[in-house]
């Protein structure tokens, strides 16, 4: 399996970091990483992580300005892409096909090649334009998975919440995250 991981400048870049950490447990999964400049700034604001440490988790790393990278072409086969978190600017670019950088171009390529694209939009509250762009992206074939809190899995920590979100995303690619607690119904089922 070959996945493109895009980390854009929305709040919640730690979600992208955790996604890369979890994907390391799937040796069959080759990861291709693009980090936007906004995301690099957000890592500095929200975490103590160094960009180099995030990049080390990926098999391949690309500059967001390199529109000639392998992942910018449909002939480079992938199983899809995850944009985590997905800023509203990136969402807008994907929804309208305005591929001004590699992250958006890679998503555009996945869509034109009928490959799965999962967007994890991080904004609150969503404005009408955000919702319209999510609908447009969904109509194009994107799966929209906002990183919402869940409670049926009885989480006790932020890490458990993050693992649940990661698990929901990985399900889209047929991967099972061992720390994901699926709903098993009530005891009366």
Curated annotation (Swiss-Prot):
Induction: By 4-hydroxybenzoate and 3,4-dihydroxybenzoate.
Enzyme Commission code: 2.5.1.129
This protein's encoding gene: shdB
Catalytic class of the enzyme: transferase
Protein function: Involved in the non-oxidative decarboxylation and detoxification of phenolic derivatives under anaerobic conditions. Flavin prenyltransferase that catalyzes the synthesis of the prenylated FMN cofactor (prenyl-FMN) for phenolic acid decarboxylase.
Keywords, ordered alphabetically: Aromatic hydrocarbons catabolism, Detoxification, Flavoprotein, FMN, Prenyltransferase, Transferase
Anything else known: It is not known, if phenolic acid decarboxylase forms a complex composed of ShdB, ShdC and ShdD. The term subunit is often used in reference to the operon, however there is no experimental evidence to prove the existence of the complex.
Subunit structure: Homododecamer.
Reactions accelerated catalytically: dimethylallyl phosphate + FMNH2 = prenylated FMNH2 + phosphate
Family stated for the protein in its record: Belongs to the UbiX/PAD1 family. YclB subfamily.
One GO molecular-function entry: carboxy-lyase activity
Classification via PANTHER family: FLAVIN PRENYLTRANSFERASE, FLAVIN PRENYLTRANSFERASE PAD1, MITOCHONDRIAL
GO biological process: catabolic process; response to toxic substance
Protein name: Probable UbiX-like flavin prenyltransferase
UniProt-listed InterPro entries: Flavin_trans-like, Flavoprotein, UbiX-like, UbiX_pad_YclB
UniProt lineage: Bacteria, Bacillati, Bacillota, Tissierellia, Sedimentibacter
Binding residues annotated for FMN, in chain numbering: 9-11, 36, 87-90, 122
Pfam (any one): Flavoprotein
